[in-house]
């Protein structure tokens, strides 16, 4: 019935669609090659976890080593941790189903409670900070809700969801879910290196903000992007739609530059060493101290004969993981216009029907009509020299490429008052304020369900599908959200079909 509606709607507007595709035909066909020579034609659950075709020789060998280290349990992880390997949170280089939707019990009144599990991983990061936005260092930047045997977790996250219904102008209903985060079972016994006594931490002195894993799609291409192009986009702006993105200038390793990596564009590189240390508790040359260094149980551990004097991850191993992330391919856009040579298939491998092709064509036009492309910029370019690994190795194969990540990598105000909270988490990172977020790259987004089995989106997983993700846009995204809401149902469904094609 829906398919019939979509086909009928497309037929009614076929002249407009044909004109749109005639104008943009060559450009749209090229979008299928999402990442130039790093494009993969792979619709399987390994679509994010496959190397680019240019990889060979010793690079291929190091990639395999990095892949193994990424997926397997990290030697020396803990004693407290959030994930036991990169892959525990980024399954198949994607987004493991997050703990914010992991049901762990219910309140006395039967209300479901979600959050930290006891299965050795939580697939989410809980940033802990004082109310002035400064990290509470003794919790090691993030809350470590998992531990090795005999060690106490730093705390457990509980999530309760509030739901609010709304409706589109045509009467169709929707529902948004708003999270309420609470940390319980705090590890309060902290070791004060000066006073040598235990002190209690008052939970009311701290606050938390939650992140679910990002997809590791297009990391190498992101690192190879011409930063001048990003800065030019920041200068552009679209005042008629209230859009004015800006760069997050970051200083890391003594270098100041345009941050691209992370939910708030808060890093200059892929943070391999930080991930091993902060998320897994694995010491390395850049972060040689245990993440729970200030905790009393570190002293207790020494009394029990536990030692922490050896680095857990070698520099060579970290470099292999860095290469692995840079050399992952990017899945092609699977649904093109009728003139493209790209196979028209869905994420499950079945052939796309003509009705669905029309829906995707209509959805792409709707994407442009809603001005989504002003922030989710379709086309960017990589600099001639490509990307540089942590050890200084150049990857020229990533250079001089035309790519289609559907992002500008800029910070945008996403609003503060939707259901009383919006997307403002009151957490600053570099120049990024609490209400500012990096535009999320959309390449590969349509394969997330195939790769990871879920469609949770946004920084904390509150959006359960594409429609909810769009409806949470506020601030600079308000105009696009309202244009989406005003569309007829067929156009809204078509826009979602288009997103599923990326």
Task: Walk through the language-model features, giving the residues of each.
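Sec-dependent N-terminal signal peptides
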Residues: 1-4
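C-terminal motif of bacterial Sec signal peptides marking the signal peptidase cleavage site
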Residues: 6-9
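Periplasmic c-type cytochrome electron-transfer domains
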Residues: 11-502
């Amino acid at each position: 019935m829906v398919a019939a509606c979509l086909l009928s709607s497309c037929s009614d507007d076929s002249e407009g669609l044909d004109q749109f595709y005639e104008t943009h035909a060559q450009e749209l066909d090229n979008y299928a090659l999402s990442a130039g020579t790093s494009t993969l034609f792979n619709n399987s659950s390994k679509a994010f976890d496959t190397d680019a075709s240019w990889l060979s020789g010793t690079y291929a060998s190091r990639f395999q080593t990095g892949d193994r280290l990424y997926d397997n349990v990290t030697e020396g992880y803990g004693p407290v941790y959030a994930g036991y390997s990169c892959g525990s949170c980024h399954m198949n280089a994607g987004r493991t189903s997050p703990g914010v939707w992991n049901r762990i019990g219910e309140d006395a009144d039967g209300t479901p409670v979600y959050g930290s599990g006891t299965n050795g991983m939580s697939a989410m990061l809980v940033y802990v900070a004082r109310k002035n936005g400064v990290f509470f260092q003794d919790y090691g930047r993030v809350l470590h809700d998992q531990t090795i045997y005999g060690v106490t977790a730093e705390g457990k996250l509980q999530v309760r969801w509030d739901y609010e219904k709304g409706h589109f102008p045509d009467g169709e209903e929707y529902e948004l879910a708003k999270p309420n985060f609470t940390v319980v079972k705090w590890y309060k016994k902290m070791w004060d290196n000066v006073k040598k006594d235990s002190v209690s931490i008052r939970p009311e002195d701290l606050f938390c903000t939650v992140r679910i894993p990002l997809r590791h799609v297009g990391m190498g291409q992101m690192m190879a992007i011409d930063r001048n192009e990003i800065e030019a986009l920041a200068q552009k702006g679209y005042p008629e739609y209230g859009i004015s993105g800006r760069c997050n200038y970051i200083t890391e390793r003594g270098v100041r530059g345009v941050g691209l990596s992370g939910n708030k564009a808060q890093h200059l590189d892929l943070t391999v060493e930080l991930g091993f240390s902060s998320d897994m508790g694995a010491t390395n040359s850049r972060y040689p101290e245990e993440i729970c260094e200030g905790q009393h149980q570190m002293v207790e551990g020494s009394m029990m004969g536990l030692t922490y004097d050896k680095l857990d991850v070698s520099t060579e191993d970290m470099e292999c993981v860095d290469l692995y992330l840079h050399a992952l391919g990017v899945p092609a856009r699977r649904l093109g216009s009728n003139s493209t040579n790209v196979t028209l298939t869905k994420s499950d491998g079945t052939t796309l029907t003509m009705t669905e092709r029309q829906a995707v064509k209509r959805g792409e036009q709707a994407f442009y009509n809603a001005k989504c492309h002003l922030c989710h910029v379709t086309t960017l370019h990589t600099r001639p020299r490509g990307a540089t690994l942590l050890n200084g190795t150049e990857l020229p194969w990533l250079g001089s490429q035309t790519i289609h990540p559907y992002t500008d990598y800029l910070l945008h105000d996403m609003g503060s008052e939707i259901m009383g909270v919006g997307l403002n988490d009151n957490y600053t990172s570099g120049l990024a304020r609490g209400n500012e977020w990096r535009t999320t790259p959309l390449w590969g987004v349509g394969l997330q369900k195939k790769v990871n089995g879920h469609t949770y989106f946004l920084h904390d997983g509150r959006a359960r599908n594409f429609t909810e993700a769009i409806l949470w846009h506020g601030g600079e995204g308000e105009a696009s959200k309202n244009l989406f809401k005003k569309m007829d149902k067929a156009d809204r469904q078509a826009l979602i079909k288009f997103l599923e094609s990326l």
